[in-house]
Amino acid sequence: MKDRLQELKQRTKEIELSRDSHVSTTETEEQGVFLQQAVIYEREPVAERHLHEIQKLQESINNLADNVQKFGQQQKSLVASMRRFSLLKRESTITKEIKIQAEYINRSLNDLVKEVKKSEVENGPSSVVTRILKSQHAAMFRHFQQIMFIYNDTIAAKQEKCKTFILRQLEVAGKEMSEEDVNDMLHQGKWEVFNESLLTEINITKAQLSEIEQRHKELVNLENQIKDLRDLFIQISLLVEEQGESINNIEMTVNSTKEYVNNTKEKFGLAVKYKKRNPCRVLCCWCCPCCSSK
């Protein structure tokens, strides 16, 4: 009889080697497939483009805040008449930049409102993208509103300074005028107050007259700035009214959610209490002490 033990051992080694190589190949293939996998949500909206626009808009609002701050710092002190022409030129440049930036930000905020409504229709009001857009719009709109209120207060304070300066110069020259007369003069455009007849009527120097004329020009420029921004403030007030309704709806939703959570807590408490008093549970605990110990 032929001894085939060596042949069997050789065959066994070959089978083991082939099995090991097959297992390693399978693991490599599985690992390769796993590395290529990625979690993809086909219906999830992409918010990167919205975030890019929001970041750009936020930078514009920050630049507007810086310009308003510069404008306010220039109004803290009255500059001498020798520097007043250069000051008026700088103020005119800053106010033009503020107007352009404010109009751009206002248009961008309106576009963001349209994106919010579009996201509500496509993704639903409770989707992540919709909530992000709403919160970002509310925060940036509130910041923009505060900046424009500060700018408006600065212009109003500058007007009062100019009126006070004109009244003081006229009092020094011996010409008594009330604040109402100055306001009427500015609104009606009575330029004859600053002509040569006033110079001959009272003892006023040409330097004082030049000071008054410069202050009057500043007031006229401020009036024009306020007229330019009037439409913008009207749009802001309309947006405030719309935001007020949204805030009321959010408050009602939060209150109803709070009541629902409280009711749920009470129901959970009753459920736990009834579970402990369940007679079947007590009977099982007496019959099966091992289960109760677990």
From Swiss-Prot:
GO cellular component, one term: SNARE complex
GO terms for biological process, alphabetical: exocytosis; intracellular protein transport; synaptic vesicle fusion to presynaptic active zone membrane; vesicle docking
Pfam families: Syntaxin
Annotated keywords: Cell membrane, Coiled coil, Cytoplasm, Membrane, Transport
GO molecular function terms noted in the UniProt entry: SNAP receptor activity; SNARE binding
Entry's localization field: Cell membrane; Cytoplasm
UniProt membrane topology term: Peripheral membrane protein
Ranges where the t-SNARE coiled-coil homology domain occurs: 209-271
CDD domains given in the database record: SNARE_syntaxin19, SynN
Keyword Disulfide bond appears in the UniProt entry: no
UniProt keyword annotation of Cytoplasm present: yes
SMART domains: t_SNARE
Entry coiled-coil feature ranges: none
Subunit structure and binding partners: Interacts with EGFR.
Family of this protein: Belongs to the syntaxin family.
Protein name stated in the entry: Syntaxin-19
Species whose genome carries this gene: Homo sapiens
